[in-house]
UniProtKB/Swiss-Prot annotation:
Family indicated by similarity: Belongs to the peptidase S8 family.
Glycosylation sites (chain numbering): N244, N284, N447
InterPro entries in UniProt: PCSK9_ProteinaseK-like, Peptidase_S8/S53_dom, Peptidase_S8/S53_dom_sf, Peptidase_S8_His-AS, Peptidase_S8_Ser-AS, Peptidase_S8_subtilisin-like, Peptidase_S8_subtilisin-rel, S8pro/Inhibitor_I9
Gene Ontology BP terms: proteolysis
Keyword Hydrolase: yes
Chain positions listed as propeptide in the UniProt record: 17-136
Organism listed in the record: Penicillium citrinum
Organism placement in taxonomy: Eukaryota, Fungi, Dikarya, Ascomycota, Pezizomycotina
Protein name as annotated: Subtilisin-like serine protease Pen c 2
Class of the enzyme per the UniProt entry, highest EC level: hydrolase
Site feature Important for catalytic activity, where: N315
Domain Inhibitor I9: 43-134
Length: 457
């Protein structure tokens, strides 16, 4: 596990900038990498400049595949021993992406000779070394009741009389689609009441199943009947991490693209009267790795397309700005709090953290059966509280096809409202550069306007 930021809490690797840029020569595009991530050998994410359209991108793909094939041909001769040594072939383009009509590029496995030519192409903005991504696993386990729902529905610290009471509007989440970009979801679990569906599996050759449990746990906190914040929301599983809880930045970017496109299609269908009752989409990503400009840009592009996005701050007890997607400024970045209203000892912090939500000893749905549950901890558990809360607040608006439809609340406005109505100053052990804000759902009110009018506390 050398260099892998996986399942344990690790210290911040460097106090310097989390991103390094290789030397630029002859006007070539820079190759960037994160100094606190595990790079995948010979794997790259190539991002086009803004002027590149789909036809130019297609021509570029043909060009790079021709170069790749030529290099692989030379390497095949080497494998046959004609030049005296053996080597491995490279796989070429793995994904192409165009996130919400904005961020465009591709990812693949290339020889360094190919990359040297790619970085000199006038259409290329930058190249990022692909790296490992992982879910934020549980730093501690204690079988306990799901106190987190109760906490976000009460202003004051929980007491004996309130610790297990969740105040909520019964229709919370109705008409909202929640995309859980993670390890998958146990869609047959009874707590989803048939509202969970399999969306897309991104890792090549992987199965449409959650073999880990992490994604299912997040989905339950978002939309489960018993364990969820928004109990009527629909869940769509977008699998970007394998059963061991790890994956690649390029697969995560592709997952964000898929979710954004699904949201755009659903929104268009609603405007055309073909998606009755649709109110909007949210997404949750309880995962991360080193700093990735491409992933942060992909998340921001999805938000610009109208998706409400929650991401975990990370479990390194460090500055969230050094990790992606926690550093994506248009998403809601979520730190973890405890039952005692403290910042969880593992939770990341800093100016990139927008809000806190319960993240220690959270009970939710699990894998293994349609009744399975598990208690785990992490900012991974805090973020779906916010994704569920975003879905909850979106659902309080009239649907697009309603006679009472109003101008749709934008992700920017809802993020501002979420912060405005949060309980301020409730938490301890909050660094001075970190917002001391704990999420609040309006205490059971179904009137969004009234909730926002109450402001913070």
């Amino acid at each position: 596990m050398k260099g892998f930021l996986g399942l344990a809490l690790l210290p911040l690797l460097t106090a310097a900038s989390p991103v390094s840029v290789e030397s630029i020569h002859n006007g070539a595009a820079p190759i960037i990498s994160s100094m606190n991530s595990q790079e995948i050998p010979d794997s790259y994410i190539v991002v086009f400049k803004k002027h590149v359209d789909t036809s130019a991108a297609a021509a570029h793909h043909s060009w790079v595949q021709d170069i790749h094939s030529a290099v692989n041909g030379r390497m095949e001769l080497k494998k046959r021993g004609l030049f005296g040594f053996d080597t491995d072939a490279f796989l070429g383009v793995k994904h192409s992406f165009h996130v919400a009509g904005s961020l465009m590029g591709y990812a693949g496995h290339f020889h360094e000779d190919v990359i040297e030519q790619v970085r000199r192409h006038p259409d290329v903005d930058y190249i990022e070394k692909d790296s490992e991504v992982h879910h934020f696993d549980s730093p501690s386990v204690e079988k306990n009741a799901p106190w987190g729902l109760a906490r976000i529905s009460h202003r004051d610290s929980l007491s004996f009389g309130t610790f297990n009471k969740y105040l909520y509007a019964e229709d919370g989440g109705e008409g909202v689609d929640a995309y859980v970009i993670d390890t998958g979801t146990n869609t047959d679990h009874v707590d989803f009441e048939g509202r969970a569906s399999w969306g897309k599996t991104i890792p090549q050759g992987d199965e449409d199943v959650d073999g880990n449990g992490h994604g299912t746990h997040c989905s339950g906190t978002i939309a489960g009947k018993k364990y969820g914040v928004a109990k009527k929301a629909n869940v769509y599983a977008v699998k970007v991490l394998r059963s061991n809880g790890s994956g690649t930045m390029s697969d995560v970017v592709k997952g964000v693209e898929w979710a954004a496109e699904a949201h755009i299609k659903k929104s268009k269908a609603a405007k055309d009267g073909k998606a009755k009752g649709f109110k909007g989409s949210v997404a949750n990503m309880s995962l991360g790795g080193g700093s990735s400009r491409t992933l942060d840009l992909a998340v921001n592009a999805a938000v610009d397309a109208g998706m409400h996005f929650a991401v975990a701050a990370g479990n390194d007890n460090a500055d969230a700005c050094n990790y992606s997607p926690a550093a994506a400024e248009k998403a809601v970045t979520v730190g973890a709090s405890t039952l005692a209203d403290e910042r969880a000892y593992f939770s990341n912090y800093g100016k990139c953290t927008d809000i806190f939500a319960p993240g220690l000893n959270i009970l939710s749905t699990w894998i293994g059966s349609k009744y399975a549950v598990n208690t785990i901890s992490g900012t991974s558990m805090a973020s779906p509280h916010i994704a569920g809360l975003l879905a909850y607040y979106v659902s309080l608006q009239p649907s697009d096809d309603s006679a009472f439809a109003v101008e749709k609340i934008t992700p920017k406005k809802l993020k501002e409202a979420l912060i405005t109505v949060a309980t301020s100053g409730a938490l301890t052990d909050i660094p001075s550069d970190t917002p001391n804000l704990l999420a609040w759902n309006g205490g059971g009110s179904s009137n969004y306007t009234d909730i926002v009018a109450q402001g913070g506390y």
